[in-house]
């Protein structure tokens, strides 16, 4: 059995850790509310660009834009994986990385070469440690993403898709050129509720033609295109619909990436809150167990001291009687 000093030292250590986990839990809780507010702020723009694209799609004479066209023999597929920049969020990163591995396995089985892109320091560390090749990584904004953060990745990904696997585009790090891709996929964590976050895979390009009946609320499929919706043209466009469609489609892809970043940020905070609450509860339980053990040790020490005193008194009494 551990000594009383050791037990008290462990109790102090557990209580110190509990303060950290409790603080992290409170911070994560507040960040979830902020993430929900950012989703609400981004929703009007996402809905309007989707509405305009729907009108443009119906007014366009031909939908032959590369972002809307299926490649006959796709050979390379870009995979953008969104992870967190910091840890202490339970299985958040491991789940999304596992889903990314499943996607890349599926792509290989289909005869496509996965081309990896990473967002978040944890994903960067994961693939670097395992010597897994990736084209580029963007870090430093997982908890508070901005539209410009999505734009940094979107510009390169759209350019790579436009040229296709037969063409080349400048490397995002400015270190030469790399081959293009025929598909764009994104792997992120969808925010379902405070207790549930699920890793999701979405294909960014080629884009499905229908752009209406979409839901942009957090916890729902932020960009689930309806295959049966019908769009009626209500506007006269200048310049023509084809030109506007070509200009807005990359912005639409950027909006989808940004929406995924916002959901991932909320999911990260929710996962961290759940993990830190569990850690705090475990710390409380462990501290209680250690305190009971310390009380037992202290009680045994007191009992032993009393026994020694009583034994000493009896010995003195016996000595006095003999005298």
Swiss-Prot record:
Keywords: ATP synthesis, Cell membrane, CF(1), Hydrogen ion transport, Ion transport, Membrane, Transport
Molecular function terms from GO: ATP binding; proton-transporting ATP synthase activity, rotational mechanism
InterPro entries membership: ATP_synth_F1_ATPase_gsu, ATP_synth_F1_gsu
Gene3D superfamilies xrefs: 3.40.1380.10, ATP synthase, gamma subunit, helix hairpin domain
Membrane-related topology note: Peripheral membrane protein
Keyword Ion transport: yes
Protein purpose: Produces ATP from ADP in the presence of a proton gradient across the membrane. The gamma chain is believed to be important in regulating ATPase activity and the flow of protons through the CF(0) complex.
The protein's assembly and partners: F-type ATPases have 2 components, CF(1) - the catalytic core - and CF(0) - the membrane proton channel. CF(1) has five subunits: alpha(3), beta(3), gamma(1), delta(1), epsilon(1). CF(0) has three main subunits: a, b and c.
Family, per entry: Belongs to the ATPase gamma chain family.
Name listed for the protein in its UniProt record: ATP synthase gamma chain
